[in-house]
Amino acid sequence: MANAASGMAVDDECKLKFLELKAKRTYRFIIYKIDEKKKMVVVEKVGEPVLNYDDFAASLPANECRYAIFDYDFVTEENCQKSKIFFIAWSPDTSRVRSKMIYASSKDRFKRELDGIQVELQATDPTEVGLDVIRGRAN
């Protein structure tokens, strides 16, 4: 079903990969992009569980918008192992205005398709999605 505001549908693979990340911890991260020709949000890349934050950050293009899911593992002050699922709306200042508008207008509907997001971040440059920011928002 297409999103009335932006006309973007969501590929079934987007939900399937997210469920695998959430339930089976099959991936560390998922990068999604909008395929303007297909008018659809699609999976661009998945990161294996052995990958880390630096691998994730390197997967975000410098000049193009993306949506991303990052499964962040951490240890609490009480020494408990936890994880939080982050949704990141990546919209760099250097990306095209049209692209920013399409991603912004499609974001809420896309997020509703992914049940289990715990923290949302909006980022326009790498510092806004740095590991220190993720660590701070996870607690």
Swiss-Prot record:
**One Pfam entry name:** Cofilin_ADF
Q: Which residues belong to any copy of the ADF-H domain?
A: 7-139
This protein's GO CC annotations = actin cytoskeleton; cytoplasm
Keyword annotations for this protein, in alphabetical order, are: Actin-binding
Keyword NAD belongs to the record: no
Entry's Gene Ontology BP terms: actin filament depolymerization
Asked whether the keyword Ligase is assigned, the reply is: no
For this UniProt entry, the molecular function terms from Gene Ontology, in alphabetical order, are: actin filament binding
SMART domains cross-referenced by the UniProt entry: ADF
Q: Which Gene3D superfamilies match?
A: Severin (3.40.20.10)
Similarity remark: Belongs to the actin-binding proteins ADF family.
Functional description taken from the UniProt entry? Actin-depolymerizing protein. Severs actin filaments (F-actin) and binds to actin monomers.
Q: What is this protein called?
A: Actin-depolymerizing factor 7
> What organism is the protein native to?
Oryza sativa subsp. japonica (Rice)
